[in-house]
Amino acid sequence: MPLAAEARVMRALYYYILTCMFGDVPFYTTMVDTDQRLAEIRRLPRTPAHEIRQELYDDLEQNALPWFTVENGRKCRASEAVDNRSGYALALMLMAKFALWNEDWNGALIPLQALEELYGDFNEGNYPLAETQWRYKNPAETIFEIQHAWSLTGTQYNGNVAAIMMPTHNGDGVFDGVPLKGYGTSMPGWSSLRANNRYAIFRPATGNTQTEHTAYIDALFNPLPLTYDTYDATLNRYTVKIDREALAAGEIRGQKIDRRVQYFLGLGDLEAGETFKITRNYGVPWPGPKFWCPDIEQNYDSNNYRIFRYADAILMMAECYCNLENAEETMRYLNLVRERAGVDPVTNFTGFEDLTLAIRCERARELGGEFQRKFDLVRWGIWYDQTYAYTNNATLKGKMRPCHRYYPIPDAQCALSGYVLTNDEYLADGL
């Protein structure tokens, strides 16, 4: 029965992903063991996502959790699981995610409090910030991650996320103008991703003046450990460089530097003080070492991909208490994450609207690049407005539509359903 419980957890995970990506989807829990049953399944209509989430919440609570016990060794943190990773902790996290989507704050707190009992105090001692880097496989903080392994002559099960999250490789271990030791020399020169300016930027103002551009001072990671370097006549502004003294002090321009910067943002070789070209010229980072794969061969990324971790659950508790208008508990859980990051706590209560914004921004900082942000923005009903407002690319802006909050069900599946399945939001948007 524990194996059946794990299967229920995996089913819930798949439907969590489906409802996050497609919204309402066909839902069934029966065995598809005949051609007739397959034909029936193909013609199922969309089931409202909130109904799917509630049914799976109940299923996990009643039919999965009871089979994960101390006696059978399965009531444990994911890092302590001997032969599986999709057990008790993941079940609790999925229940909490389902409840948050359905705005059932008390319902979400039940599994979140169980996770807190299981994982204990959230702090640097128990959960080192350095271990949020994906190169650390199944650390204590993990709740669920995709398992990878790759070696030239052994197991080869890998992804390629690191190849688009590392700075552009110029060859011979030089990444965007900076030699990086320990990351190999064979990674292809892929077009790497970069967050928009809302996430992190330190760009000097136009002209021969050492002042910050006022249009970019509301970045989520602010300040960055960057300082003015030399005036560039072509750019008509100062270039910037890593400030090693500020990094060592943990403070720059009178403000604390978020400890997450060194892992989540790629500014250059922080130890050597060598700055990436894109950072030097434009004041923006690449994705950071959190995503980089040591000794990567070609694009074979052997890191595990972190899907859920304890910091996420802590911030979910803050969100629940905020919606229940409990300011004291909201700030307590929010500040657990901020304390580990080494930034000042939120102590001045100015209203639940401000607290809501603080939680949303903290989730962006803490969980950036961990496959959750779009789901959060859609869940909060602000995906289109926020994405449109902060997208730097004018061409991309022209193609964005509110219906893009969800993917359309593919035409092939709509046809197989006899067009019981449709994409009404896309049709209403003229697509």
Feature locations, PLM:
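Extended, hydrophobic/aromatic-rich amphipathic alpha-helical segments that build helical scaffolds
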Residues: M1-F27, R53-F68, A81-E116, F144, ...
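Glycine- and aromatic-rich loop/turn segments at beta-sheet edges
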Residues: D24-F27, M31, L65-E80, D121-L129, ...
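Short coil/linker segments at helix-helix boundaries
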Residues: D24-H50
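An aromatic- and glycine-enriched ligand-binding surface/loop that stacks and positions planar moieties
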Residues: T29, Y57, E61-F68, R85-L270
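Extracellular loop and loop/strand-boundary signature of outer-membrane beta-barrel proteins
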Residues: E40-P45, A81, S302-N303
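Long, intrinsically disordered, low-complexity segments
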Residues: E55-Y57, T132-S192, R198, E297-I307, ...
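C-terminal substrate/ligand-recognition segments
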Residues: A233-V337
